[in-house]
Amino acid sequence: VGVPGADLGIRPEDVTLATLLKEQGYATGQFGKNHLGDRNEFLPTEHGFDEFFGNLYHLNAEEEPEDPDYPQNPAFRERFGPRGVVHSFADGRVTDTGPLNKKRMETVDLEFLDSALQFIRRAAEDDKPFFVWFNSTRMHFWTHTPKEEEGLSGQGFYNDAMVGHDNLVG
């Protein structure tokens, strides 16, 4: 994604693994980051996924509105500002769950994990095969970690985030 609202993204003719698996009866979900376009037609739920809960940009794009130099004009924000964390479904429902600001970045992967686990539970209860694509935000530079992860590695914030990621996924 070049800039928010750009008309570039995954194309309708691009076949995804989710599309192929859905044709075989799988429940398909993507949770976490997705960088294949931010307009609704580019959301994973338009490309084979039953459910998507995640962010659409590299992390520093999402924290830009917190910068004191970021334009405060509402028209600018409406046209060029990043979308919030999106929860969408194959039936066309799309909800903006709020901005991915610096504070939320500390724990957003826990939100994504919880949503992925709920998806898996529902598929298991329905005795349906499933495919989950989980993309945490932790391995980005710059990342924001919660206080509890500071110093875990003894090698700086990036490696602390990696230890936090390892703890998240097991």
Tell what function each PLM region has:
Residues 1-170:
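Formylglycine-dependent sulfatase
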